[in-house]
């Protein structure tokens, strides 16, 4: 549904951005929290879906669905990378070739509608080595996205870099407070507990949304 006269931010991404059903609490995507840091007059439509890559999101018709609704002055926030590195043919893209080809479809599609695309690098996974150093698990995808954003003159928000800095500052133990690390029996959805280093809890999702909002301000995006 298009809401005439209301500026809208559409979110296209994976599980780190997606909304979750109440029974999955406390796991949260940061897209569920971004409304806390932008003007109330701006509408957020979160179309991010767990497990999707820049390729599979398009192949399933999800970008087309957004482009049927988006209008001049709206924004399309695009965050993929976690699943683009998967080996299955449905999702895999190569960071310096097909990844760019699919991301350009988001860029070109939004611009054709008079809307503004924004590229957002995939969130850093919380993986520390035995020496307490953070491990890069995304390979070239974040750098590749930044290069494409520069080439296409698209605003770029480096949430990979920002979240990595935060994890390094907090360290191995304290950074768990942002992720879905739960004891057995703590929540019905996770009876055996969980140690998830990719997906954030409510506190972490809100912190990431704050990072995104800070970047929006620094980029002087015309939101609100």
Show which residues each predicted segment covers.
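Structural motif
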Residues: 53-61
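Short, basic, glycine/proline-bearing loop/turn elements
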Residues: 14, 47-52, 91-92, 128
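Alpha-helical cap/lid subdomain in secreted, periplasmic
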Residues: 4, 61-206, 210-224
